[in-house]
Regions:
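Acidic, PIN/NYN-like endoribonuclease modules and their adjacent C-terminal/linker elements
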Residues: 1, 34, 97-130
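Short, well-structured N-terminal submotif of metal-dependent ribonuclease cores
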Residues: 1-34, 44-57, 130
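Residues within well-formed alpha-helices
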Residues: 5, 54-57, 78, 82, ...
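Phosphate- and divalent-cation-binding pockets in alpha/beta enzyme and binding domains
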Residues: 12, 36, 78, 116-117
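Short glycine-enriched loop/turn motifs at secondary-structure junctions
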Residues: 21-23, 63-64, 99-102
Length: 130
């Protein structure tokens, strides 16, 4: 099982292969991942960094992704503790770390800042480490 964050999901949804390279993994994410990923895709399209067609394809891939939403008991409290420990004002990224910690699995991200800070809390890997 792997927790995936919006950065890795958006990257996959925009790639030619989509999420296929992650098909062998059981993927989970906190509920906020879908809002974050959708927002990133919308912003990329709005800024004209991606075409309308690619945005539509990526959004379809996101909605069809075989990723299970998870909200275990204590997720919010754990995210607050992690944000405090790491000196973060916001709990968005901490929620991914908290989910991985509560489920006793690793977090997969392409976000270097999250990876560097998060390794103090839980196992965090990038796509090349799969």
């Amino acid at each position: 099982m792997l927790v995936v964050d919006a950065s890795v999901v958006v990257t996959a949804c925009l790639s030619e292969a989509g999420l296929d390279p992650l098909a062998k993994e059981q993927l989970v994410a906190p509920h906020l991942m879908w809002s974050e990923a959708s927002s990133v895709l919308h912003e990329l399209r709005w800024r004209k960094e991606i075409s309308n067609e690619l945005a539509a394809t990526a959004l379809r891939r996101l909605s069809e992704a075989d990723i299970s939403p998870r909200r275990p008991k204590g997720l919010t409290d754990e995210a607050w503790r992690i944000a405090d420990r790491l000196g973060w004002a916001k709990t968005y990224d901490a929620e991914y770390l908290a989910l991985a910690r509560l489920l006793r699995c690793q977090l997969l991200t392409t976000d270097a800042k999250l990876k560097n800070a998060g390794t103090r809390v839980v196992g965090v890997i990038g796509p090349t480490e799969l």
